[in-house]
A protein has these predicted regions:
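N-terminal Lys/Arg-rich, disordered targeting/topogenic segments
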Residues: 1-14
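Active-site-adjacent "subsite" loops/lids of carbohydrate-active enzymes
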Residues: 83-100, 173-222
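Catalytic domains of carbohydrate-active enzymes, especially glycoside hydrolases
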Residues: 107-132, 223-235, 288-292
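Aromatic-lined carbohydrate-recognition surfaces of secreted/lumenal glycan-active proteins
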Residues: 96, 165-175, 233-235, 252-295, ...
Length: 343
């Protein structure tokens, strides 16, 4: 039986429409897969999707390990021209150099640093949540190539040769690569089935009390100490909060234990381990350490100092300042190197 012409035309149109719908579905599915990929978190147990992630991927995350034997030179200066390493901590007044300045204005920053007098305290960022800025030789180190790593190595060497008081700063628990490769050491997110919580910088956070975390931080601090740094500041020394953060321990107790164990691991009579904390009421370990505070207005300096439990706040309390306001000068203060006029 022959199919009528009109029926054939109708079937042809239906077939064309069906094919178009199939193509549209496949295209939409492909676009969805590409879009959702940015929200996937990989764990040891598989992958999960978290739509609360910030889709912005930090620039400069490309990383590679250094060539063996070409890492930072380890230097011990015990001569008469060495930096003052007496057992007594002194009140600090100096400058700090952020990652942004190292990345965007390196030559100007280097010139300013090398114009400073001997023993001036200078703090530089040596690592971020996405890798090391200098050529670390640690087995777990991932180098962040968003800055000139060789230039950072040379800057550290030049600062040491000029006998500045060298301070290294890096985030204590914010570490994407270590968290990715050591999931049990990371802080999980609520309802994630073991997947790790990730912050707006797309970094995982480590548990302060975890033995792997403490061992990892100890190795970094010891490497920096061996490179000639007089002090290391553990930045962001706190536990993140929020409904998505599944942290079951007591943050204050765990941070206190972590600080004490780290100081015990790296302590010498001339090396200082310090902590940037979220509250001035945090109790520091006994020994050579300082408390650093960010974003404190000059008008609140005295009130903030009164909230600490420090026996010598003028020495053990350091404010990170972006102004020349003299109200900071009663205590330790590090000002951005931007405030230093070029010669």
């Amino acid at each position: 039986m022959a199919i009528p012409y009109r029926t054939r035309q109708r079937l042809k149109r239906l077939g064309t429409l069906g094919l178009a719908l199939i193509v549209l579905f496949l295209f939409s599915w492909l676009c969805w897969v590409i879009w959702v990929e940015r929200y996937i978190i990989y764990t040891e147990d598989g992958a999960v999707i978290d739509f609360d992630l910030n889709p912005q991927i930090p620039m400069g995350e490309v990383a590679q390990r250094p060539v063996p034997g070409e890492g930072p030179e380890i230097h011990y200066n015990e001569g008469e021209n060495a930096v003052n390493t007496s057992t007594d901590l002194l009140q600090m007044s100096g400058y700090y150099v952020s990652y942004d300045l190292l990345k965007e204005d390196f030559d100007n920053v280097k010139a300013k640093i090398l114009s400073l007098p001997t023993n001036t305290p200078v703090m530089i960022d040596v690592k971020g949540g996405h890798g090391f800025y200098y050529s670390s030789e640690l087995s777990d180190a991932v180098i962040n190539n968003s800055v000139d790593n060789a230039a950072i190595d040379e800057l550290i060497k030049a600062m040491r040769q000029k006998n500045l008081y060298l301070i290294a700063r890096f985030p204590a628990f914010q570490d994407y690569h270590y968290g990715l490769n050591h999931v049990p050491s990371g802080i999980p997110f609520t309802g994630g089935g073991g997947a790790l919580w990730m912050d707006d910088d797309r970094c995982y956070w480590l548990k302060p009390k975890d033995s792997g975390t403490i061992g990892y931080l100890t190795s970094i601090i010891l490497e920096l100490r061996g490179m000639g740094f007089n002090e290391v500041v553990l930045d962001k020394f706190w536990v993140p909060t929020g409904t998505k953060v599944n942290y079951t321990g007591d943050p204050i107790e765990d941070l206190t234990e972590c600080a004490n164990r780290l100081l015990s691991n790296v302590s010498t009579n001339s090396f200082t381990l310090s902590f940037t904390v979220s509250s001035p009421s945090f109790v520091l370990p006994e020994g050579r350490c300082r408390m650093y505070l960010n974003n404190i207005p000059a008008r609140d300096v005295e009130m903030t100092a009164s909230q600490t439990t420090l026996t010598e706040p003028q020495i053990k309390l350091v404010f990170i300042a972006d102004s020349m306001d003299t109200r900071f000068d009663s205590y330790g203060v590090l000002r951005t190197i931007d405030l230093l006029d070029s010669d």
